[in-house]
Curated annotation (Swiss-Prot):
Any Pfam family the entry gives: Pantoate_ligase
Residues spanning the signal sequence: none
Species per Swiss-Prot/TrEMBL record: Burkholderia multivorans (strain ATCC 17616 / 249)
Descriptive protein name: Pantothenate synthetase
UniProt EC number: 6.3.2.1
Subcellular location: Cytoplasm
UniProt keyword Transmembrane helix present: no
Family the entry assigns: Belongs to the pantothenate synthetase family.
Length: 279
């Protein structure tokens, strides 16, 4: 595996490749990330991964400086997955001058849910993903359903900007107790780690109630928030939305069996966890 930081060297290395499969990450890799590499290999060759902690998607009170950087360990994991190139640019490589041009998603998708609680987050995501796509020029790129809203925004961005890349969605990888794998799980204390799977269990109960025919989605969402708050969580949102566009469904859509997803974000202690479950 070649480890490359220069954009020009990356382009030289990939010249002539027309089936490249790309997996962008911020590093601190876990089994969830590695499953993306394996899925990428099913859709293209060679597989290219990137590791870049993108300052643009961190808010002023978020953990950019504390975000775990484990490059050597990540390199060893990617080598075992037969990744062809790891693109690991420095901030100077990616942003040699101030990044004045940004890619901003529409408010109806980028300003809700995560976008409401993390203003500017998806602008940072779209800007760096578009730039990485321009550098790697993949045929396919793999994103996890764990970040459901991000997946949808990136897919729509590629469609609307006519980027010649297919976005492949990867299922969420969970620990044996149901907790979705995340780099932020390492911040949990032992007691918090024992409690953390309750987020997934809460979403499962919401899913079951919707499938059983409950139609008062507002009450379902409020019950779930109240349940978590009673266990010491601080929920930002628990929301049932249409899978197609993350708009709240109306009664007719519910009766017609519109595919739905329930999404959640909540703090447990100092750690903010997100999860979702398709209905």
């Amino acid at each position: 595996m070649k480890v490359i930081s220069s954009i020009q060297e990356l382009r030289d290395q990939l010249r002539g490749q027309n089936r490249t499969a790309f997996v962008p990450t911020m590093g601190n890799l876990h089994e969830g990330h590695l499953s993306l590499m394996r899925l990428a290999r099913q859709h293209g060759d060679p597989v290219v991964a990137s590791i870049f902690v993108n300052r643009l998607q961190f808010g002023p009170n978020e953990d950019f400086d504390k975000y775990p950087r484990t490059l050597q360990d990540d390199i060893e994991k990617l080598q075992k997955e037969n990744v062809y190139v790891l693109f690991a640019p420095t901030e100077r490589d990616m942003y040699p001058e101030p990044q004045e041009y940004r890619v901003q998603p529409p408010d109806d998708l980028g300003g809700i849910l995560e976008g409401e609680f993390r203003p500017g987050f998806f602008t940072g995501v779209c800007t760096v993903v578009a730039k990485l796509m321009a550098c790697v020029q993949p045929r396919v790129a793999v994103f996890g359903k764990k970040d459901y809203q991000q997946l949808m925004i990136v897919r729509r961005m590629c469609q609307q900007l006519a980027l010649p890349v297919d976005i492949v969605a990867a299922e969420t990888v969970r620990d044996t107790d149901g907790l979705a794998l995340s780099s932020r799980n390492r911040y949990l204390s032992d007691a918090e780690r024992s409690e953390a799977p309750e987020l997934a269990r809460t979403l499962q109960r919401v899913r079951e109630r919707v499938l059983a025919g409950e139609r008062d989605l507002g009450k379902l969402e409020q019950d779930a928030r109240t349940h978590l708050a009673g266990r010491g969580w601080a929920p930002d949102y628990i929301s049932i939305r249409r899978r197609a566009n993350l708009i709240a469904p109306n009664a007719a859509e519910l009766d017609a069996g519109e595919p739905l997803v329930v999404l959640a974000a909540a703090k447990l202690g100092a750690t903010r966890l997100i999860d979702n479950l398709e209905i």
